[in-house]
Design a protein with these regions (language model features):
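C-terminal beta-signal and adjacent terminal beta-strands/loops
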Residues: 366, 374-389
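Extracellular loop and loop/strand-boundary signature of outer-membrane beta-barrel proteins
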Residues: 70-73, 108, 151-156, 192-201, ...
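Short sequence motifs at beta-strands and strand-loop junctions characteristic
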Residues: 25, 72-80, 113-115, 160-162, ...
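Outer-membrane beta-barrel proteins
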Residues: 42-46, 112-114, 143-147, 189-194, ...
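Outer-membrane beta-barrel "beta-signal"
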Residues: 394-410
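Detector for outer-membrane/organellar transmembrane beta-barrel domains
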Residues: 219-350, 354
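Bacterial Sec-dependent N-terminal signal peptides
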Residues: 1-20
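Outer membrane beta-barrel
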Residues: 20-53, 61-190, 207, 212-223, ...
């Protein structure tokens, strides 16, 4: 009882002090977004999300009794679910910090009736040299200053991180053109795969957040940076063996490292990024992990991550009429130890994926009309359990996508 009274007293005291620090100056509410319609033609069926808006790679062929690929089926879509609406609130000050909030939704929710999906929801505190962000935003490995300029809503998948998660992110200006960025991230609907399917439970039960550190240089023409990312998951909290059921605390700790570059000059822009990642399938990238060893008496497992390289380059030229080109390549490097299986993750039987994609976009004030073609090839094969889970006997399968988009921005 005494502890509750002390806590209540401290909260009341803090609240009264905060009212003295928090001031209102020119409260503003700004709206933004766009109305967008997309027509899409695919030469075959694909692994995708958001009702075909987010294309990853073509399905592995499945052959019927006549030897025909069931998934070699052209299909077309006319969609408007990528339309977006955002609201920014500003005008508060907390001491020397300006305070703002942002919330954004689109209509790609998990529903056949265009359900609303929350994209961003965060509060920012901005001091002269430091910014602190609380809430749901792009994962720090996304790199908001350097991501592909493509018409396709997949924003460079499956070569570029696509992940919005709850986080605490600090950005500090070390010098005029140099920032240090640190983040602590928890998974939500962008989550790892595992024995119970895709769920954030694995990371949350490991308790420690996904930790991130990054250095970013920038000036009028250049942005360049490098980052490291660490994560721990607990795939199981109990196992069953011949001697019964036992609690387990066996975790899988993994790393990712990346470097990126952007150059802008007049109407020309060039971007590139390369990332080495272990078990980063929560970011909608091919990857995962496998069981490395098993104690039959207790059911205790150890795990080994899949290692991948993800690379992309992108350039655009123009203003009213803009031509662009994107190319991406990823490679499955296998597991860190020889696996015994099973594998958990995304596309664990794919050896490599590449994509080439030109685009042409016309913009006039708030109006945009664009065309984009993409050629995506994935190499499916067999997992070699004697050679670190690498893929053998791989065969290529390709999808050709044509896309037309019309949008009005506000």
């Amino acid at each position: 009882m005494k502890q509750n009274l002390i806590v209540m007293f401290l909260l009341i005291s803090f609240g009264s002090q905060a009212q003295g620090f928090l001031t209102s100056k020119n409260i503003k509410i700004d709206f933004s977004g766009f109305v967008r319609n997309d027509f899409i033609f695919d030469s075959r069926k694909n692994v995708c999300a958001c009702d075909h808006l987010l294309e990853f790679f073509p399905y592995e062929p499945v052959y019927d009794e006549n030897g025909e690929d069931i998934y070699a089926q052209p299909n077309a879509h006319f969609l408007n679910t990528f339309s977006r609406f955002g609201t920014r609130f500003s005008g508060l000050e907390l001491g020397k910090a300006t305070v703002s909030g942002y919330i954004e939704v689109d209509f790609t929710g998990y529903s056949p009736t265009n359900g609303i999906r929350l994209r961003h929801a965060y509060t920012s505190f901005v001091w002269p040299k430091t910014t602190l962000l609380f809430g749901r935003a792009w994962h720090p490995t996304f790199i908001e200053k350097v991501y592909p300029s493509v018409l396709n809503e997949n924003t460079g998948l499956p070569f570029q991180v696509f992940n919005r998660s709850p986080q605490l992110r600090l950005t500090h200006h070390l010098a005029k053109n140099l920032d240090f960025i640190a983040g602590a991230v928890y998974q939500f609907n962008y989550a790892n795969d595992g024995p119970d399917g895709k769920t954030y439970r694995y990371q949350r039960e490991a308790v420690v957040p996904n930790l991130h550190a990054q250095l970013q240089f920038f000036n009028e023409n250049w942005v360049a940076g490098a980052a490291v990312d660490w994560k721990s998951i607990l795939p199981r909290n109990a196992t069953a063996g011949t001697n019964g059921t036992f609690k387990t605390t066996e975790k899988l700790n993994t790393w990712a490292a990346l470097a990126y570059l952007k150059y802008t000059k007049n109407k020309f822009e060039f971007k590139a990024k390369s990332m080495y990642g272990q078990n980063v399938n929560e970011s909608l990238l091919p990857g995962g992990y496998a069981v490395a060893s098993l104690d039959a008496s207790t059911g205790t497992e150890t795990y080994t991550p899949l290692n991948h390289m993800y690379n992309w380059v992108n350039f655009t030229y123009g203003q009213t009429w803009k031509f662009g080109f994107f190319a991406g390549y990823l490679k499955n490097l296998g597991t860190s130890e020889n696996p015994i299986g099973p594998f958990y993750g995304m596309a664990t039987d794919i050896d490599m994926v590449y994509k080439i994609s030109p685009q042409l976009i016309y913009t006039y004030k708030n109006f945009m009309f664009g065309w984009e073609m993409s050629w995506t090839t994935a190499a499916y094969g067999d997992i070699d359990y004697t050679n670190f889970g690498k893929i053998k006997n791989a065969e290529n399968v390709t999808n050709f996508r044509n896309m037309l988009s019309v949008a009005y921005n506000f």
